[in-house]
């Protein structure tokens, strides 16, 4: 474990972005985080289950619905117009209330997951759709305030810990600023051609983001063009998730975001874990970028993939049985396929 951090070095690492983190063995630099070591429980926990569930599941049209519904010609775009109306009037904000979770039963689900052999459980925290599934203090777009009107993350956490399972949360928020750019577009053809989608309404900017008028329409999976204000908002929001739900694992959908903001968040996660475990870091952070995890720092995650050779450090693969968000009439992976994957990976 890392030794004591000089006060001047600690202050310099945090002052760059004006970020406050839990004091402990780490500061928000790559050099400091190299001292991180993966906890033994994660090495031994070979199988976990993830509930990739949120408001985009409500239409039952598969993954990325909140983005695809604004892409003219996409099946989700057509389905949305048929079942909700034109995107200039009825957008994703109007889909959210249909996500009610009337039959949500985390206790029953966790019993099933435990019987299946899962040693840890993941709850969705927030997807690219900018909707928090916890009692978030940084946005009104959360599951306690609307939709199910339940603390989904909190209820899942309670059920998992009750059964001795480790608890994880996933965050996909960082890219939301760019991902939702299509909601500021308009139809190119038809009776609504040129009529802006509902993302351009200032009343909805806290969901769809207040994008500059000249913001590039082409989506790219990076942080180019993302303002510091959004980076700070991301840090504050995910820190709120960490502080209130103390996850054993925090998963980011992509690489570690926004350099000093992301590094400070990971340092905060590890330091808070050390505070709660007598100086021992029991938390795990995952990144999909190999370079992030080359020396300590975090656990490498492969989405729908796996390592090409035996690795000295533990890694994780995440995959789904069908579509990431629920999709009606889709073929699921067979039990044999799932078992073969587990045998191959574990």
Model-derived features with residue positions:
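N-terminal export signals
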Residues: 1-14
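Mature catalytic domains of secreted/periplasmic carbohydrate-active enzymes
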Residues: 12-346
């Amino acid at each position: 474990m890392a030794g004591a951090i000089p006060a001047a070095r600690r202050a310099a690492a945090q002052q760059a972005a004006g970020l406050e983190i839990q004091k402990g063995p780490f500061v928000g630099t790559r050099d400091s985080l190299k001292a991180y070591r993966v906890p033994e429980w994660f090495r031994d926990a070979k199988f976990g289950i993830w509930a990739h569930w949120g408001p985009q599941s409500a239409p039952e049209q598969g993954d990325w619905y909140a983005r695809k519904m604004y892409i003219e010609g996409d099946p989700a775009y057509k389905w949305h117009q048929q079942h909700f109306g034109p995107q200039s009037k009825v957008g994703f904000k109007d889909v959210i209330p249909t996500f009610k979770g009337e039959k949500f039963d985390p206790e029953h689900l966790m019993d099933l997951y435990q019987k299946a052999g899962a040693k840890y459980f993941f709850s969705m925290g927030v997807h690219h759709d900018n909707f928090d599934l916890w009692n978030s203090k940084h946005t009104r777009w959360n599951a306690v305030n609307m939709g199910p009107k339940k603390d989904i993350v909190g209820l899942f956490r309670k059920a998992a810990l009750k059964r001795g399972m480790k608890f994880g949360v996933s965050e996909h928020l960082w890219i939301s600023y760019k991902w939702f750019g299509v909601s500021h577009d308009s139809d190119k053809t038809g009776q609504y051609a040129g009529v802006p989608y509902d993302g351009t309404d200032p009343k909805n900017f806290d969901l769809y983001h207040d994008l500059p008028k000249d913001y590039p329409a082409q989506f790219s999976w990076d942080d180019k063009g993302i303002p510091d204000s959004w980076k700070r908002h991301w840090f504050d929001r995910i820190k709120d998730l960490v502080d209130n739900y103390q996850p054993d694992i925090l998963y980011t959908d992509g690489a570690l975001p926004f350099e000093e903001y992301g590094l400070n968040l990971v340092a905060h996660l590890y330091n808070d874990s050390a505070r709660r475990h007598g100086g021992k870091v029991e938390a795990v952070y995952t990144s999909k970028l190999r370079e992030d995890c080359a020396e300590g720092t975090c656990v490498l995650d492969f989405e729908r993939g796996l390592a090409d050779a035996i690795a000295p450090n533990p890694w994780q693969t995440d995959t789904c049985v069908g579509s990431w968000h629920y999709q009606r009439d889709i073929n699921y992976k067979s039990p044999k396929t799932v078992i073969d994957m587990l045998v191959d990976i574990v």
